[in-house]
Amino acid sequence: MAKKSKQLRAALEKIDSTKAYSVEEAVALAKETNFAKFDATVEVAYNLNIDVKKADQQIRGAMVLPHGTGKTARVLVFARGAKAEEAKAAGADFVGEDDLVAKINDGWLDFDVVIATPDMMALVGRLGRVLGPRNLMPNPKTGTVTMDVAKAVEESKGGKITYRADRAGIVQAIIGKVSFDADKLAENFKAFNEVIQKAKPATAKGTYVTSLTITTTQGPGIKVDVNSL
C-alpha cells in the first residue's frame, strides 16, 4: 500500500491540477502517469449538466470505437433456431435459452455483453435483478435487442462500447488501453466525444459538459479541455 501511495504521489506531481489539458496532452499524461504493472484500461468521464429524472434528458447508447477497446468481449446471446445458429457463426461465446437463465441465476457471470432477439425478452426479463445493476440487460437503444444478431455480435467483438448517464449526470466510457499509441487513444476519445455532443438534449440548459477527465486503472484523473476535442 505504501509503495502504491508513493507511485500515486509521483504521478500526481506530473499533473497541474489547475489546468485543463488538450486531448493530446491529456492522453500523453495518462500514459506517462500510469504505474500499473498490467495493460491498464484508459477511461474518460463526462460530468454533464442534465437532469436524468426527465425522460428527455436521459443519455444512453452505444458506438464502435475506431480502434476498439483493446479487449475482446465475451458475448452471450439469447436466441433460438436459425438466430441461435447465426449468433454462433458470428462468434458468440455463449448461445442459449432457459439453460443460460438457470446458469446465470446460479451465479454465473463470465460474460461482458448480453444480446437477445425480441422474442426472447420475456425470458431474459427474469434476469432483470441480476443483469440490470451490472448494465448488462439487453436494450434496443444499445442495439442489443435485435433480430440482426450477427451484426450485434460482430460489433461487440469489434470494440463496441455502451454508455449511460448515471443519476448524477456522469457518463463513463473505456477508450482503450495504455498500450495503444497516443494517436489511437486520441482518435477514440474524439469519436466518443462527438457522440456525447450529438446526444445533448434539446431541453438541457447552460453549459452541457461541466467537467471532463481521463484516467487509467489506478492512475490519477487528468482534466481535459473539452474545447480541444
UniProtKB/Swiss-Prot annotation:
Cited PROSITE patterns: RIBOSOMAL_L1
UniProt keyword terms in alphabetical order: Repressor, Ribonucleoprotein, Ribosomal protein, RNA-binding, rRNA-binding, Translation regulation, tRNA-binding
A single cellular component GO annotation: large ribosomal subunit
GO biological process, one term: regulation of translation
One MF term in the entry's GO annotations: tRNA binding
Record bears the keyword Cytoplasm: no
Function noted in UniProt: Binds directly to 23S rRNA. The L1 stalk is quite mobile in the ribosome, and is involved in E site tRNA release.
NCBIfam families: rplA_bact
Subunit comment: Part of the 50S ribosomal subunit.
Protein family per UniProt: Belongs to the universal ribosomal protein uL1 family.
Name of protein: Large ribosomal subunit protein uL1
Organism per entry: Streptococcus gordonii (strain Challis / ATCC 35105 / BCRC 15272 / CH1 / DL1 / V288)
Lineage start: Bacteria, Bacillati, Bacillota, Bacilli, Lactobacillales
